């Protein structure tokens, strides 16, 4: 073979090789595009919780114009294919006679959304319309077969009252004090419960801003007698205290946030004692992360304020709107070591608000509370190392968990509604979305009365 032929053959070989590579690349791209078009994201419950969430997922994300366009194009497709599933306790609670499903949901107040549009710059405007969201929220609640609802940021109570009454609920509402229009609401299924007592807390009366909380005593209605088909009242009816709270947001006022939680738990305990030491279930938006000192206070019933900077006690960090980014709660640790400088962060007034006393740095409560979600094994894609959801809210400045359900030992978590993986949430571009009517995800737990099981 001549030198010219060798060169020509080599050139042809290179050309063919390049064509093959291009063909392979084109095929890969076609397969990728097809797989994306057919993609269906379904959350499957794991049998056990496996820690190991990667810190690589914790970095703030800056959205370029091109990425925003891509997110908008794919958002409808992704959100429409996502499902949430129930995961069950490792214990067998199938034989429990008396159970209830408690749902906690921050609905995103209409006025709050309008006043903070920078948080939803990547959300299509139709997804923020209350006329659409209210129906989406009520349909979602119906899917969970809820017995009791603890709702926050409710500023259109009359709308909800009509829609939920049609679904068999009755409710009570308490607006925030001052100029704010939103508040809290507790609803219950009328055929399942009777309201025995109702109290509310206006925190401004205690010098702790205009937030509010609610406490209800509910009694389970009598079951139908299988022979007579009549309702028979039990000599020992099931009763419980249900608490609902929306804690102050301001991360710098950890003294007020801690004080609100303390007072709320004090009132819940007192009401439980007044009705014969009945079980307690509390829920709401605590504006505190699972890594925070406030979370530790609820779980352990004791906290030494001298160990913590009040500006970091809730575990939240602020991000400027111009940064167009979010912070994940699991990327931030709220703990602080003891130092003389930290002691100066708490004035006497701040200590009194937080602890309720004048000459103490410790804050305590008398309820022995367990987190519903940490009591049911989950997946590393949706849970942190404490078993709490990785994210219950997502907007342009925050992706993390601030919503919780807690219960006393007389109640056990039978199952919980798993949240969405953080990576799936990020790919939606932000909440609300096509399928989710708020910037928070509803959290839900089925609770059973423990003496039915033991």
From Swiss-Prot:
Mg(2+) binds at residue 153. Keywords: Cytoplasm, Exonuclease, Hydrolase, Magnesium, Metal-binding, Nuclease, Nucleus, Repeat, RNA-binding, Transcription, Transcription regulation. The gene is CCR4-5. It catalyses: Exonucleolytic cleavage of poly(A) to 5'-AMP. It comes from Arabidopsis thaliana. Residues 31-41 have a biased composition (Basic and acidic residues). Residues 1-76 are annotated as: Disordered. SUPFAM superfamilies: DNase I-like (SSF56219). This is Carbon catabolite repressor protein 4 homolog 5. It is found in: Nucleus; Cytoplasm. Its main location: nucleus. Component of the CCR4-NOT complex, at least composed of CRR4 and CAF1 proteins. Its cofactor is Mg(2+). Signal peptide: none annotated. One of its GO terms (cellular component) is nucleus.
